[in-house]
Amino acid sequence: MMNKLYIGNLSPAVTADDLRQLFGDRKLPLAGQVLLKSGYAFVDYPDQNWAIRAIETLSGKVELHGKIMEVDYSVSKKLRSRRIQIRNIPPHLQWEVLDGLLAEYGTVENVEQVNTDTETAVVNVTYMTREEAKLAIEKLSGHQFEDYSFKISYIPDEEVSSPSPPHRAREQGHGPGSSSQARQIDFPLRILVPTQFVGAIIGKEGLTIKNITKQTQSRVDIHRKENSGAAEKPVTIHATPEGTSEACRMILEIMQKEADETKLAEEVPLKILAHNGFVGRLIGKEGRNLKKIEHETGTKITISSLQDLSIYNPERTITVRGTIEACANAEIEIMKKLREAFENDMLAVNQQANLIPGLNLSALGIFSTGLSVLPPPAGPRGVPPSPPYHPFATHSGYFSSLYPHHHFGPFPHHHSYPEQETVSLFIPTQAVGAIIGKKGAHIKQLARFAGASIKIAPAEGPDVSERMVIITGPPEAQFKAQGRIFGKLKEENFFNPKEEVKLEAHIRVPSSTAGRVIGKGGKTVNELQNLTSAEVIVPRDQTPDENEEVIVRIIGHFFASQTAQRKIREIVQQVKQQEQRYPQGVAPQRSK
């Protein structure tokens, strides 16, 4: 697809040859024709990088016949839809910060980094609606970050310019959550590097890491802010499998050189982080896969203990010892196995027919795993690359049991509107500020991200230890909002590092169904507690409210609480269906 540029604020004296010469002088040669109008012109570039270079080099900077010319993408009003391009992003800006900024103005479907030779970064962003894209352009144009000012343009929305029937888009992989195998699946390599080597990997003014990313066509995120004071820092590498392996090899060489020069360490092992759900398949039956990799590459491979895992740290550390060449070869084989496991799991997830409408498991982003949510510059034009791997996304069995009566699909608007639910979540009083954020920024962003209403109820007294957060929204919104709140409390150290975040949640159920939740002799509630690991309390002597509802208390970690909430809602739904089937109180006959 050609990148058509608009050249504005031209003097009437300007000719097509003037423009050709000016572009040529700036080493921006025009291959196609110049379409000259009165006061403006259009030119085409087949490559997006050249188009970006022309905009950055000329717009507002070059005078032609006494007038400063303007250069931008030419996007007709009918094509000004959901896609925008943001340029002049600081090279050192953490991707997580940019993600949060974009989410303030709407639901981001896709963010694609554009590989350019400019010092600053460029991303193409697709919002869910054209209104959100318009708002983002209005609010972010000229947004100052340190000494950098964002430059934003509309770019053509391929789905608008060449519309196709919904079923074709689904088959071809357009839209979030699609499982098309035609596109490159992004499964990043995560490694741990000693903190003392981080500076060497980045290099003076970021030159070393820029060289790595340029040579390997990769994006390398060094999560320096994670685990302050820790001996090791996670690094995430997004690229093709070949690019990932080459970037990993270069990082190993830099670390070994630094270790030799500083004599800080004799050996620098390669430490790969992998989600626990994949490790069994990497090891293989009786350890055969791992032994084969060790034998073929001449390395020694060990894997961290299961005891180091928690719900907030689902990754195991795979330590590879050997020469740089041997470790690099082992990385290739290890990642082959991990990618295969990931792709199989994602295929299973996408085939699930038992999930929430429109639930994009990979994009939930409910816990801070150190992964950027920006996809890599992979995937054909117009097809968003697969979302980054989220550790909890592969638990297809967990999700299918959690949401047994909902259907997954990339087009949520094709389904009936999901039922609204209200949950009261109790958080430590001292955490209220962190949840609200500066001038309410965090809670607003969270509400937009989750698609829920989130309010913090007034304190019942001056010395209360907990405050109630009222969340209203459909099941997926509840999952996202509650998950982010659990994660935020962990991130902000309101709980000890080795302590799981356990919160109390209240849901209201019709008083007529409370007995069914308890079960005969407490059998149902006991089974529920055993199944979910949550504490479930249904007070027997509770007086129903004006809506004839009573409160069920649920106490536990995030997954435990979510499972209990879903199962209780399921019981309530079953009772409702029975009441609709037998409205006159005629109970179904039971066979003895």
Curated annotation (Swiss-Prot):
The record's annotation in SMART domains points to: KH, RRM
Listed GO cellular component terms? cytoplasm; cytoplasmic stress granule; cytoskeleton; cytosol; nucleus; P-body
Its main localization is nucleus
Q: Quick one: where's region Disordered?
A: 157-182
State the Pfam families in the record: KH_1, RRM_1
User: Which residue positions does Phosphothreonine occur at?
Assistant: T543
Q: Which residues form the signal peptide?
A: none
The record ties this protein, via InterPro entries, to:
IGF2BP2_RRM1 (IPR034843), KH_dom (IPR004087), KH_dom_type_1 (IPR004088), KH_dom_type_1_sf (IPR036612), Nucleotide-bd_a/b_plait_sf (IPR012677), RBD_domain_sf (IPR035979), RRM_dom (IPR000504)
Tissue specificity note: Expressed in oocytes, granulosa cells of small and growing follicles and Leydig cells of the testis (at protein level). Expressed in testis and ovary.
What GO terms in the biological process aspect are recorded for it?
cold-induced thermogenesis; CRD-mediated mRNA stabilization; energy homeostasis; mRNA transport; negative regulation of translation
Does this entry carry the keyword Heme? no
The RRM domain extends over: 3-76, 82-157
Query: What GO molecular-function term can you cite, just one?
Result: mRNA 3'-UTR binding
| Domain called KH: residue spans | 186-251, 267-334, 420-485, 502-568
The protein's UniProt keywords, in alphabetical order, are: Cytoplasm, mRNA transport, Nucleus, Phosphoprotein, Repeat, RNA-binding, Translation regulation, Transport
Identify residues that carry Phosphoserine. S11, S162, S164
Per UniProt, subcellular location reads as: Nucleus; Cytoplasm; Cytoplasm, P-body; Cytoplasm, Stress granule
Which segments cross the bilayer?
Answer: none
Q: What does this protein do?
A: RNA-binding factor that recruits target transcripts to cytoplasmic protein-RNA complexes (mRNPs). This transcript 'caging' into mRNPs allows mRNA transport and transient storage. It also modulates the rate and location at which target transcripts encounter the translational apparatus and shields them from endonuclease attacks or microRNA-mediated degradation. Preferentially binds to N6-methyladenosine (m6A)-containing mRNAs and increases their stability. Binds to the 5'-UTR of the insulin-like growth factor 2 (IGF2) mRNAs. Binding is isoform-specific.
Domain notes, please?
Answer: Domains KH3 and KH4 are the major RNA-binding modules, although KH1 and KH2 may also contribute. The contribution to RNA-binding of individual KH domains may be target-specific. KH1 and KH2, and possibly KH3 and KH4, promote the formation of higher ordered protein-RNA complexes, which may be essential for IGF2BP1 cytoplasmic retention. KH domains are required for RNA-dependent homo- and heterooligomerization and for localization to stress granules.
For this chain, the family text in UniProt reads: Belongs to the RRM IMP/VICKZ family.
Q: What is this protein called?
A: Insulin-like growth factor 2 mRNA-binding protein 2
State the organism of origin.
Mus musculus (Mouse)
